[in-house]
């Protein structure tokens, strides 16, 4: 089962990716992890990636596709894989197709921007333990304080409204066009496309995914 997850940051992909990996026994492939592993292994592709990154440049789509092909040929991908955060653009999706990488399901997590902002901006963190709260959905017993230690909770820089809105704009400009791309691919019979209502409770989203993936 070869799956691509699409959806804005904060749409709940990470939580459900974990569930899909455990339920279907497939690894999650993140391009960041893959690049780091390739550089560490010192493979030919890894050396190329290191040279580009050391020069402060972005790794080319061709190189990332070559790394994806190398990664999905490994034993743990025998039953499939889960791609999250790639492809990000239509040229990357085209390059994947040209490289012969077949995808069985493209799952879009649909959540309105305002709810995403609400979800992320309301997060509060106890830095020392990693405990995460939410002012609305999972508040601490005492406002602004960790339940266990009573220490102050903080907001991560990534969770500030300005940062979240900027990431959403980037997502809509770069990645959202992939939705139309993969819907057309599904119409042509090259993959299956499903939109998942990400506003539901975690268990309901999970049930919807099980229904789609079988």
UniProtKB/Swiss-Prot annotation:
Keywords: ATP-binding, Cytoplasm, Kinase, Nucleotide biosynthesis, Nucleotide-binding, Transferase. Belongs to the adenylate kinase family. Residues 122-159 are annotated as: LID. GO terms for molecular function: adenylate kinase activity; ATP binding; nucleoside diphosphate kinase activity. Consists of three domains, a large central CORE domain and two small peripheral domains, NMPbind and LID, which undergo movements during catalysis. The LID domain closes over the site of phosphoryl transfer upon ATP binding. Assembling and dissambling the active center during each catalytic cycle provides an effective means to prevent ATP hydrolysis. Residues 30-59 are annotated as: NMP. AMP binds at residues 31, 36, 57-59, 85-88, 92, 156, 167. SUPFAM superfamilies: P-loop containing nucleoside triphosphate hydrolases (SSF52540). GO terms for biological process: AMP salvage; nucleoside diphosphate metabolic process; nucleoside monophosphate metabolic process. It catalyses: AMP + ATP = 2 ADP. This is Adenylate kinase. Its EC number is 2.7.4.3. It holds the Pfam family ADK. ATP binds at residues 10-15, 123, 132-133, 200.
């Amino acid at each position: 089962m070869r799956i691509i997850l699409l959806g804005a940051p904060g749409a709940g992909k990470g939580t459900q990716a974990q569930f899909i990996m455990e339920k279907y026994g497939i690894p999650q492939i993140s391009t960041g992890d893959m690049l780091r592993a390739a550089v560490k292994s010192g493979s030919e592709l890894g050396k190329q990636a290191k040279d580009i990154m050391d020069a402060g440049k972005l790794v080319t789509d061709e190189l990332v596709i070559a790394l994806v092909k190398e990664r999905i040929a490994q034993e743990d991908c025998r039953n499939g894989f889960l791609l999250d955060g790639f492809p990000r653009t239509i040229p990357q999706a085209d390059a994947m197709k040209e490289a012969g990488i077949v995808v069985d399901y493209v799952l879009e997590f649909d959540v309105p921007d305002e709810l995403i902002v609400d979800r992320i901006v309301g997060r509060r963190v106890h830095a020392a333990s990693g405990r995460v709260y939410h002012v609305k959905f999972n508040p601490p017993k005492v406002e602004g304080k960790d339940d266990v230690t009573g220490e102050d909770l903080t907001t991560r820089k990534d969770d500030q409204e300005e940062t979240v809105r900027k990431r959403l704009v980037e997502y809509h400009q770069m990645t959202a066009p992939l939705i139309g791309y993969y819907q057309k691919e599904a119409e042509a019979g090259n993959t299956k496309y499903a939109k998942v209502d990400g506003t539901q409770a975690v268990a309901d989203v999970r049930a919807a995914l099980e229904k789609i993936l079988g």
